[in-house]
Amino acid sequence: MRTLIDSALFVRDPEVVRSRAAEYGYLALRGIPGPEAVVPLCTLIQEVAESLGLLQPTRDARAAPLVRPGAALTGTGYDDARWLTLQERVLADPRFAAVGDCAELLTVLEALFAGPVLTRRGDICRLALPSATHLTTPPHQDHWYTGGTMNLWTVWIALTETPIELGPLAVLPGSHMSGLLPHAGHGAGRQGVRATDEEEFAAAPLAAGDAIFFNCLTVHRALPNVTRDRVRLSVDYRYQPANEPIHVVRVDGTRAGV
């Protein structure tokens, strides 16, 4: 597996930001938004997940929390009642919006789009339980699920220390240049593209507050959480240029969600 190329040194140079994004289909930014920015949100998610019986109590918001013994998500994970409750409670809390709207992220996105940014384009919080590799997000392109503008970008943020064995995000560099690929599969969030050689994906151990920006056509996946008892916590925020319309038609003319 390849290593992510860090672009954090270039975030103040819009031309380099756009050049790297066009070449790689992603931007890995270590320290952006940074650990302090995500502590309140991480604490919130841990508290809600604890109340739902998914996590053990913890006092260290930067360390990957421990799973509650016997906790597991049913079905595809996305249709588990506790997962849905987690989304409802977390996404409605100002601490979730505060991270997605922080200046550190929006500055990069404004450079990327060369203009104003539209937020709230499909945000979600995630937790990856151990012993649940069957629920690991398969390789896919976000455009398959969202449709709309080809300039939709996702920002994936690690909320705790996330070594490779905890299952961080992996991206396929340059895959955005191949257009929309065929997706297949059954169940919510389970449609994906044909498996690509794992060695072609890029990933890296991440610290709390590290972010990976990627285009809606960039093939990406989660790596499996192969730890014994730790839970990966992360969030996705999605953005597009404010001057482009919102719709769900894919580039091939089909409609997302159908």
Which sequence ranges carry the predicted segments?
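Non-heme Fe(II)-dependent double-stranded beta-helix
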Residues: M1-E23, R30-P139, Y145-T146
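Non-heme Fe(II)/2-oxoglutarate
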Residues: R2-S7, C42, S51-A61, A72, ...
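Short hydrophobic-aromatic micro-motifs
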Residues: L27-L29, V155, I212-F214
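Short, solvent-exposed loop/turn segments at secondary-structure junctions
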Residues: P33-P35, C125-L127, W144, T162-I164, ...
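Active-site rim elements
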Residues: D93-A98, D197-A202, A222-L223
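Catalytic core of non-heme Fe(II) oxygenases with the double-stranded beta-helix
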Residues: T107-E110, T133-A203, E244-T254
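A structural signal for short, well-ordered beta-strand segments
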Residues: G122-D123, V155-I157, V235-Y239
